[in-house]
């Protein structure tokens, strides 16, 4: 008989503990949801800020591309001039050898 009287007590304790845990889980899920919303807003703001720099990045890219093009052209011109000088020196040596 004592088992039957203690059984409702155990059930009540279990139900109270279950309800407390469910409430705690619910509170924690609400906190997680709030934090996810905050994170989402922050990511959206970061994306917007990044978009504001697209024009600046494009401008710098154009600048660097132009500078690289100038450097490449300068190297080609220098190489062509060196080849002309080298071939001119070779012709002078050949002419001197003939004399």
From Swiss-Prot:
Stretches assigned to coiled coil: none
- Keywords, in A-Z order: Cell cycle, Cell division, Centromere, Chromosome, Cytoplasm, Cytoskeleton, Kinetochore, Microtubule, Mitosis, Nucleus
A GO-annotated cellular component: mitotic spindle pole body
Does the record carry Nucleus as a key word?
A: yes
Localization terms from the record: Chromosome, Centromere, Kinetochore; Cytoplasm, Cytoskeleton, Spindle; Nucleus
Q: Where is the composition biased (Acidic residues)?
A: 89-99
Q: What happens when the gene is disrupted?
A: Inviable.
Q: Which InterPro entries match?
A: DASH_Dad1
Matching entries from Pfam families are given as: DASH_Dad1
Positions of the region Disordered? 69-99
Q: Which domain of life is it from?
A: Eukaryota
In this chain, composition skew of type Basic and acidic residues spans: 73-83
Gene Ontology BP terms: cell division; filamentous growth; mitotic spindle organization
What's the stated role of this polypeptide? Component of the DASH complex that connects microtubules with kinetochores and couples microtubule depolymerisation to chromosome movement; it is involved in retrieving kinetochores to the spindle poles before their re-orientation on the spindle in early mitosis and allows microtubule depolymerization to pull chromosomes apart and resist detachment during anaphase.
Q: Which family does it belong to?
A: Belongs to the DASH complex DAD1 family.
Q: How does it assemble?
A: Component of the DASH complex consisting of ASK1, DAD1, DAD2, DAD3, DAD4, DAM1, DUO1, HSK3, SPC19 and SPC34, with a stoichiometry of one copy of each subunit per complex. Multiple DASH complexes oligomerize to form a ring that encircles spindle microtubules and organizes the rod-like NDC80 complexes of the outer kinetochore. DASH complex oligomerization strengthens microtubule attachments. On cytoplasmic microtubules, DASH complexes appear to form patches instead of rings.
PANTHER family to which the protein is assigned, alphabetical? DASH COMPLEX SUBUNIT DAD1
**Which protein, by its recorded name, is this?**
DASH complex subunit DAD1
- What is the species listed in this Swiss-Prot or TrEMBL entry? Candida albicans (strain SC5314 / ATCC MYA-2876)
